[in-house]
């Protein structure tokens, strides 16, 4: 997913969600936390979203606890009650955009049977990146699944010296490897 699409998603989640009237809720004059402005509703069949959202959840643990409580109460909703509670998405926009991905230096060893080994300083991409899945009525749900991937890379030749049939002669074997210079969170290809 492109950064522009992610920004659009975050803008939608930050106050442009519809209220019970179907119109976007007007911005309140007092400042509020990002989480308090991002509401979603668990709707039963034929239920309308409530006009007043519940207060913000503080953590994933509270969110998951609410999910369990809602699963226990699903029998009531299926028996005809239209009562639905608002659920706050516990998303921090900085956590969604920013991942912990970096290039970690290591010494890579290249060798082949009968050849002398060569050591080359390289980098590997290591860290965690955010992922997101938003279900909806659209057959293609919004999915963001980032991986820690090379941002700057180049191919470099590596020369190995290998022995031939006689111990006195050697030949060059040229191979190439990718040298990683930097990493970032990027959608999986």
From Swiss-Prot:
Residues 101-186 form the CTCK domain. Induction: Down-regulation during the establishment of embryonic left-right axis could be due to translation repression, involving BICC1 and possibly DICER1, and/or transcript degradation, involving BICC1 and the CCR4-NOT complex. Attenuated DAND5 expression lifts repression of NODAL and defines leftness by induction of the left lateral plate mesoderm NODAL signaling cascade. Keywords: Disulfide bond, Glycoprotein, Heterotaxy, Secreted, Signal. Residues 1-22 form the signal peptide. Disulfide bonds join 101-148, 115-162, 125-183, 129-185. Antagonist of the extracellular signaling protein NODAL, which is required for correct left-right patterning during embryonic development. Antagonist of BMP and TGF-beta signaling. Independently of its role in left-right axis establishment, plays a role during heart development, possibly through the regulation of TGF-beta/Nodal signaling pathway. Displays anti-angiogenic activity by inhibiting endothelial sprouting, migration, and proliferation. Once internalized by endothelial cells, may alter their redox and glycolytic balance. This is DAN domain family member 5. It comes from Homo sapiens (Human). The gene is DAND5.
């Amino acid at each position: 997913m492109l950064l522009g699409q992610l920004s659009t998603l975050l803008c939608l989640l930050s106050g442009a969600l519809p209220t019970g009237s179907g119109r976007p809720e007007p911005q309140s004059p007092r400042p509020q936390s990002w989480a308090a402005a991002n509401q979603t509703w668990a709707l039963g069949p034929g239920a309308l979203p409530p006009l007043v959202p519940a207060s913000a959840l503080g953590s994933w643990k509270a969110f998951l606890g609410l999910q369990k409580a809602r699963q226990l109460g699903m029998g009531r909703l299926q028996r005809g009650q239209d009562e639905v509670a608002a659920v706050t998405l516990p998303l921090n926009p900085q956590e969604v955009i920013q991942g912990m991905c970096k290039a970690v230096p290591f010494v890579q060893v290249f060798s082949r049977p009968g050849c002398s080994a060569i050591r080359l300083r390289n980098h590997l991409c290591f860290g965690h990146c955010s992922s997101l899945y938003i279900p909806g009525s659209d057959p293609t749900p919004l999915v963001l699944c980032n991986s820690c991937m090379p941002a700057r890379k180049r191919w470099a030749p590596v020369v190995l010296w290998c022995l031939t049939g006689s111990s006195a002669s050697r030949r060059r074997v040229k191979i190439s490897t990718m040298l990683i210079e930097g990493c970032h969170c990027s959608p999986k290809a």
